């Protein structure tokens, strides 16, 4: 049986698409290989959101070219955001790649029989893509140029996929999109994300629903109310701010101010005091000075996120920022600001997690990791526990006995649902 190998980098949407492609390969008679050297087909699912990620993809492709020189029968496939809209350019740059197709352009749910390419035994927490593309065109972001405009799947289609995943063993779904808060605006019925959450909430056997990524300007009160009143919807929200300074936010075309963002967070916390918030932040954006960076730092400190995904700005081809704005913050200064935010996150999250010592939590167990069961709380915190019982897929009550900024250690109290 021929083998295939998947190399994936980037967001959870990339991972979801790789999972789907892997299932297709298996239906075509391939088996998963342990490494690229043992495969007849290698798929690279790429990301170019950051320069560092793009460099990794290019390096991987050149390694595969060397492998192909040794084994001319090897077939290489490339997808993801490196491909973008103009495949001919990629073919010229990487002529040794055999198959090239854009992100999300593989056969999808609407073109194949129901459940045809879902895994026979899906993970406890399964990714489900609900929409592709983005209409926002933030000045630093290449995604709209690579994934195109927003295109939503219908509630009925998504519901069928989720129901089938649950039937096969999943207990949680993570709804994915570049901007899930604008879900449905392109559909005839004009449903919104809150409508989708309500529809999925009724699926028997589904224990939890998560979603990402959100855009602060598109979060409605209806969505906040749905999160607050639907028990299966996790108290976890990714709320990328990108900067805490109004001038930088305007340069980024984010569509909100520092104060508007703070007011949104206040509304969310009023509705859900136990909400876990995560954010994305860019440091060293063109023209960002020390005072402007301090506005971002203060916002991070004031809100107290459970996770801050911080990155140093790197210009991305095709974007307005790369074309019209000088990348004028020195690399050494970007690194300094990056470390300050990382240190703040470690301190903030460490204190928040320490406050959970000796408390109880409900954890959905996803699987084994280094001989310990691994799962997440309703707020998305990573928890490890030891038990000889078969806990995969179980919802359990635990007592936390050890904390760190990155995870919690807990003891099993009892099984709530198996």
UniProtKB/Swiss-Prot annotation:
SUPFAM superfamilies in alphabetical order: Radical SAM enzymes
NCBIfam families attached to this UniProt entry: MiaB/RimO family radical SAM methylthiotransferase, PRK14336.1
Record protein name field: tRNA-2-methylthio-N(6)-dimethylallyladenosine synthase
Gene3D superfamilies tied to this protein: Methylthiotransferase, N-terminal domain (3.40.50.12160), tm_1862 like domain (3.80.30.20)
Membership in a protein family: Belongs to the methylthiotransferase family. MiaB subfamily.
Catalytic activity: N(6)-dimethylallyladenosine(37) in tRNA + (sulfur carrier)-SH + AH2 + 2 S-adenosyl-L-methionine = 2-methylsulfanyl-N(6)-dimethylallyladenosine(37) in tRNA + (sulfur carrier)-H + 5'-deoxyadenosine + L-methionine + A + S-adenosyl-L-homocysteine + 2 H(+)
Subunit structure: Monomer.
Gene: miaB
Listed InterPro entries: Elp3/MiaA/NifB-like_rSAM, Methylthiotransferase, Methylthiotransferase_CS, Methylthiotransferase_N, Methylthiotransferase_N_sf, MiaB_methiolase, rSAM, rSAM_horseshoe
Enzyme nomenclature, EC number: 2.8.4.3
